[in-house]
Every structure is written in C-alpha cells, then in structure tokens.
Amino acid sequence: MFISGLENGHTTEAPFTFAIKNEDINPVDYEEISNIFRPGHADYSKYVKYNGNAFKTGGGIFSGRMTAPIVVAGTVVRDILLKMGIMLESKIIFGESGTGAKIKVSVHGVKAGVGEPFFDSFESEIAHAMFSIPAVKGVNFGEIENLYNKKIEDIYEEYEIKDGEPKLKHNYWGGVDGGITNGEEI
C-alpha cells in the first residue's frame, strides 16, 4: 500500500512511502530452532553483533522478506529510468543443483561519463546496492567469467567509429572503464 509520494500513477514531491503487510507471520514455527545457528542464515553473526538481542522468529532486518521493499523501490526506479531512455533486461539462469541461480542484467542507454574513479565508481555503487539484497554473494561486470583465464592479446579491446561515434568492437568489460561508463551496454 502506497502511503505517500505517489498520486494518480506519478511520483510527487512528498517522500515515497509504502507499507507491505506480512500476513505470513507465525513465530511458533521458529520456537524449536530459536537457539540453533542455522547455516546460510545470519543467526550466528547477528547473535555476536547484537549480543544475543536480535529476532529469533525469522523476522527482522536479516529476513528474506526484506527483498520485498527492494523490489517495490526497484520497480519505481525502473520506470524513472525508462523515461530517461535507459532500459534494463534481465534473465534468471538456474544452477543444475537447484540451490542457486545467476541473474544476468543488461542495461542499455546509459551515456558515457557516469561514475567516478575509485571509491564511487559506477561498478562499486551498483555492487553496493546489489549486496544489500539478501543472499547475493557476487556481482560481475562484462564477460569476466569467460575472460579471466585468457591471454591479454586474446581479449584486447579496440574502438571503432560507428555512426560518427567511438564504439568498442567487443565490449568485454561491460560498458565501464576506470569506474566510468563508456556508453556501451552494461
């Protein structure tokens, strides 16, 4: 439910506020395991950080339920980006074991020159946001999974002029050089 910041399908000057009611709350389900540190969960790390004073009922900031508000915010941002001529495509690639997946995201329409070198690089800002999503364990840009083991001469990148603009022949590095976008697909 949208509380403020949205009116007649448009954002307003008010802070963007929404609420998602969790109707699947059942703390009893967690009673038997409330004193067990579950692998793959934040049980132990939050126990240490907060001196044992943290949710033991599956809720709280470490819950997978925290993905829901990120999805809502992402939907609003996607619509804003579309109006700016920036389009996102995504594809889920499931692992054979069924225990995980990759999400491939391609971004088109980002102009060259976005980002900063070093700590505020385009990649570091995106990675920072991605790692805020529960269960994300890695972020790659470009074709790094296919290229890390190749010789540099096999992946040498060159610019060519297309339609009067410099364009990369291959775009191996995913549209970002030196932390700054180069106008290619990300």
Model-derived regions, located:
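Generic N-terminal targeting/processing segments that precede catalytic cores or assembly contacts
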Residues: 1-186
